[in-house]
């Protein structure tokens, strides 16, 4: 169940990141805070609160994951959010994200590193010391 909590935390933090990106594209600059009170910005402000709530919920899930998983297995899973956010940002036309070969290689290296860390090697090096 620890991996489930960790993956749910990653999903929430990734959704929060995408939501906050969209919100910041639709709100006035931070220097014009008084404009944020304009009723025309009610929807983006509500989504901003939703994004922040997703971050808080993500932390709660992360705490649950840490109760059940060793840190050396749980912490690398956070890098999945880089992969998820990059992939999802490409699918949102409004973000106008570009995907280059070097970014693809970066995502592939993250995935490869996760496999090396999280999958058991089955060799002597994986047995715990006493």
From Swiss-Prot:
Q: Which GO terms describe its cellular component?
A: plasma membrane
Q: Name the source organism.
A: Sodalis glossinidius (strain morsitans)
Pfam families for this protein: EamA
Cytoplasmic compartment segments: 1-4, 66-74, 125-130
Protein name (database record): Probable 4-amino-4-deoxy-L-arabinose-phosphoundecaprenol flippase subunit ArnF
Functional note: Translocates 4-amino-4-deoxy-L-arabinose-phosphoundecaprenol (alpha-L-Ara4N-phosphoundecaprenol) from the cytoplasmic to the periplasmic side of the inner membrane.
**Single annotated GO MF:** carbohydrate derivative transmembrane transporter activity
Q: Which UniProt keywords apply?
A: Cell inner membrane, Cell membrane, Lipid A biosynthesis, Lipid biosynthesis, Lipid metabolism, Lipopolysaccharide biosynthesis, Membrane, Transmembrane, Transmembrane helix, Transport
Intervals, Periplasmic compartment? 26-44, 96-103
* Membership in a protein family: Belongs to the ArnF family.
What metabolic or biological pathway is this protein involved in? Bacterial outer membrane biogenesis; lipopolysaccharide biosynthesis
Kindly list the places in or outside the cell where this protein is found, as annotated in its UniProt entry: Cell inner membrane
* BP term (GO), one: lipopolysaccharide biosynthetic process
- Assembly with partners or alone: Heterodimer of ArnE and ArnF.
């Amino acid at each position: 169940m620890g991996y489930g909590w960790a993956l749910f935390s990653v999903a929430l933090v990734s959704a929060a990141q995408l939501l906050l990106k969209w919100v910041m594209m639709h709100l006035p600059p931070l220097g014009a805070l008084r404009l944020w009170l304009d009723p025309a910005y009610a929807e983006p402000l509500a989504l901003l609160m939703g994004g922040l709530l997703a971050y808080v919920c993500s932390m709660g899930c992360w705490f649950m994951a840490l109760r059940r998983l060793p840190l050396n297995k749980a912490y690398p899973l956070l890098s999945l959010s880089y992969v998820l956010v990059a992939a999802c940002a490409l699918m949102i036309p409004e973000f106008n994200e570009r995907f280059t070969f070097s970014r693809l290689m970066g995502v592939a290296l993250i995935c490869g590193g996760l496999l090396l860390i999280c999958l058991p090697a089955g060799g002597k090096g994986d047995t715990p010391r006493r």
